[in-house]
Amino acid sequence: QNAHPSPK
């Protein structure tokens, strides 16, 4: 799981 905003 990745609870971080995507750089796109």
UniProtKB/Swiss-Prot annotation:
Principal localisation: secreted
Keywords: Hypotensive agent, Metalloenzyme inhibitor, Metalloprotease inhibitor, Protease inhibitor, Pyrrolidone carboxylic acid, Secreted, Toxin
Intracellular or extracellular location(s): Secreted
Keyword presence, Secreted: yes
A GO biological-process term: regulation of blood pressure
Tissue: Expressed by the venom gland.
GO MF entry, a single one: toxin activity
A cellular-component GO term for this protein: extracellular region
Sites bearing Pyrrolidone carboxylic acid, chain numbering: Q1
Family listed: Belongs to the bradykinin-potentiating peptide family.
Function field: This peptide both inhibits the activity of the angiotensin-converting enzyme (ACE) and enhances the action of bradykinin by inhibiting the peptidases that inactivate it. It acts as an indirect hypotensive agent.
The protein's name: Bradykinin-potentiating peptide 8a
